[in-house]
UniProtKB/Swiss-Prot annotation:
Family to which this protein belongs: Belongs to the protein kinase superfamily. Tyr protein kinase family. CSF-1/PDGF receptor subfamily.
GO cellular component: cell-cell junction; external side of plasma membrane; extracellular space; fibrillar center; plasma membrane; receptor complex
Subunit organization: Monomer in the absence of bound KITLG/SCF. Homodimer in the presence of bound KITLG/SCF, forming a heterotetramer with two KITLG/SCF molecules. Interacts (via phosphorylated tyrosine residues) with the adapter proteins GRB2 and GRB7 (via SH2 domain), and SH2B2/APS. Interacts (via C-terminus) with MPDZ (via the tenth PDZ domain). Interacts (via phosphorylated tyrosine residues) with PIK3R1 and PIK3 catalytic subunit. Interacts (via phosphorylated tyrosine) with CRK (isoform Crk-II), FYN, SHC1 and MATK/CHK (via SH2 domain). Interacts with LYN and FES/FPS.
Free-text description of this protein's post-translational modifications in UniProt: Ubiquitinated by SOCS6. KIT is rapidly ubiquitinated after autophosphorylation induced by KITLG/SCF binding, leading to internalization and degradation.
Protein name stated in the entry: Mast/stem cell growth factor receptor Kit
Name of the gene encoding the protein in the UniProt record: KIT
Further comment: Numerous proteins are phosphorylated in response to KIT signaling, but it is not evident to determine which are directly phosphorylated by KIT under in vivo conditions.
Residue positions the entry lists as glycosylated: N96, N132, N147, N286, N296, N303, N355, N370, N403, N466, N489
Sequence ranges assigned to domain Protein kinase in this UniProt record: 592-940
Amino acid sequence: MRGARGAWDFLCVLLLLLLLGVQTGSSQPSVSPGEPSLPSIHPAKSELIVSVGDELRLSCTDPGFVKWTFETLGQLNENTHNEWITEKAEAGHTGNYTCTNRDGLSRSIYVFVRDPAKLFLVDLPLYGKEGNDTLVRCPLTDPEVTNYSLRGCEGKPLPKDLTFVADPKAGITIRNVKREYHRLCLHCSADQKGRTVLSKKFTLKVRAAIRAVPVVSVSKTSSLLKEGEAFSVMCFIKDVSSFVDSMWIKENSQQTNAQTQSNSWHHGDFNFERQEKLIISSARVNDSGVFMCYANNTFGSANVTTTLEVVDKGFINIFPMMSTTIFVNDGENVDLIVEYEAYPKPEHQQWIYMNRTFTDKWEDYPKSDNESNIRYVSELHLTRLKGNEGGTYTFQVSNSDVNSSVTFNVYVNTKPEILTHESLTNGMLQCVVAGFPEPAVDWYFCPGAEQRCSVPIGPMDVQMQNSSLSPSGKLVVQSSIDYSAFKHNGTVECRAYNNVGRSSAFFNFAFKGNSKEQIHPHTLFTPLLIGFVIAAGMMCIIVMILTYKYLQKPMYEVQWKVVEEINGNNYVYIDPTQLPYDHKWEFPRNRLSFGKTLGAGAFGKVVEATAYGLIKSDAAMTVAVKMLKPSAHLTEREALMSELKVLSYLGNHMNIVNLLGACTVGGPTLVITEYCCYGDLLNFLRRKRDSFICSKQEDHGEVALYKNLLHSKESSCSDSTNEYMDMKPGVSYVVPTKADKRRSARIGSYIERDVTPAIMEDDELALDLEDLLSFSYQVAKGMAFLASKNCIHRDLAARNILLTHGRITKICDFGLARDIKNDSNYVVKGNARLPVKWMAPESIFNCVYTFESDVWSYGIFLWELFSLGSSPYPGMPVDSKFYKMIKEGFRMLSPEHAPAEMYDIMKTCWDADPLKRPTFKQIVQLIEKQISDSTNHIYSNLANCSPNPERPVVDHSVRINSVGSSASSTQPLLVHEDV
């Protein structure tokens, strides 16, 4: 039927053409055709819905030729028949059908093929350009659904700023695509018959908008080569996408045998990098020139250049940085500096003086760290030049191709030195004088044996005078006169002088009969003069010995320093003598009952005492009293008073030895502090070595109790020398469990006489890792408190940590009560004895004491702690080798019982850069992670419930202003040359 219809159409068209031909040939006037008309489509609708599997039939009517076009998801299908027939429609037949006639006029109808199993037509992948709109091609096959929109994958929300417009025929258009949408996963979504249907997953890939030119750089901006050497340079091109072009270009279009290699990759989504490598395997002189790396994108272009210079052979060019003729005064320093260019690299450099090569005092280094650097600097440091050290100083440098040198003439301004003065056989007196500038020589005569002549001898009598230059740069002058004309006894003076100074020599003559002989100068000295010189020399020696012995005496100085101001590494300390003292701290002397001496030093001592009514009116309390010895001087008395003021300024803290009172009137100054019965931590650790339990166990149950009772060895505070408190015999003691041992002290170590004796027992408990962690934690807390008060300790070590009931540690400063003269830990340096092995490098070499240097000392303390009281840097004496190893970064290995985390803290405390060391507050936080919850809880309870004694409290909310300030008087331990 379709074929018959087509034949009928063909006959109609043929008949029409014949009729037109007849009309054209006749004499009838022609009739112009009407306006073109649109073809008509049946069914005459803009949209048509067809169910899947049904027949799709569309017809197009037009007087002329027509063509059907079907478009869906960007694909086109054509048909030149009047009808478009699809016997079984599918979802994929959804789309726009257009009929076009020969005049180009057309009509369209959009067909939906409803398919319950396929609601969306999906076209993948999904691309978008930043700043533009992009279409998610997911047109519907059923226009009657609702809530047609976008959804994020897996229930994730879409970006808040994402907006879109939905079109069932085309899909969903995302407006103004942003770079942040890259790799956004989404679905097209619609509600169909009460349920939500999702399309396949779309992943949006965003192409970044190019808003800047590429970033271009090269590995080196200049290169110098000899002929035959290989040359390569890398160009780095960075852009947001790979749509960038790049190339190497030689300027001025010069020919070259260069080759290029290219590599590129993406670093993330919008970070594209390309490397263009320029290679010349064997450079020639005509390869010299400027090479440009050029890159461009749609925004613009960028370029960078590198210069290649190829020489036929190597070279060395020396540039003195000063005049080669130098004048310097005797005793002054001078630096001879040259810069030089060398290619290939210099192989040998040296400074030479008087045929002697310097092995030190000079340094040679490149002008820059650039790989293509060819400029170097050499410096010779001449210190405290003497008159005989002038002369020629030569710098020599060589490489594989050439040698070169430069010479400096150094003249040292020195006063004249009379080298020889003698009577010649020809009747002449001669003076040979050396100095710079050139000395002048005058001759004088006077009768008798004098030491100074004033009558000049006329220049006409000077027979000879000439000069020459010595190798050391001095000018040597020879001057002679004829002494035959002298008729009387007398003295001839040869006097040489220049603008630096003068010198003289004497000739003495006496006549014996008719002969004349010279009297040598030594005959002029009388026994009286000799005796005077000997006596004066002995007096000088005695004064020097007494001065030396006085300087060797240890000078007492308060170690704790309160910082007033910090300017970089310059710390301004508050002068402790200017700190206020509140007389409410005063305590009656007659209420103190003194006991045994706990410790003594060169100037002072600490004595155990009982204070009556210090805390309560009817209570006795054991305290420690620091006082001066009768041999102490005014300096020590002022220092003890300063220590008292510093303690009162700081206030109370659980982990420092707190001030309880003082006696400053009516007698010698007494400083009353807390009493710590177990002595210093260093000796405590050494006593507990044999009972140390290596494993860290929890503080509960029978295991902990059994562990504490394993060690039955009796030990008391009197077992070791120089420690606190002999426990009284005849008292029954109770060994507490580990859970009890930190509760055994009344708060803050304020122990009263009426406390049960069971609380006053010596610490017989074993020592374990949890104890060591607790000690390190408490000391860090105490140091953090001192730092918060702007206080620097300067002598933090286990020997300066005291231990009291409950194993509470307290930081102290023994000061004048420590015998540092006989303590091997303190090394004599300058006018002080210093704990060198505990000191930070900046304190050793530059005399800089800061909060950071205290942190270094804390790291050494940790090493002592976890080695159970071993001396740091074992087996290593404090000598030049020790200083050198500290400078070179030598650090101790982890002690035997230190956990890895604690050794990490030690290493950070020992960082060569003070600013990279942790603060004490940070150290406290680090150690809190290591200690058990029970230990932390016990410590917190003690700290929270610890009462302050009823003594005055200084308000620290406002910094105390010092009338004067004093820096440390300690000298630097080691100058650079000593290492």
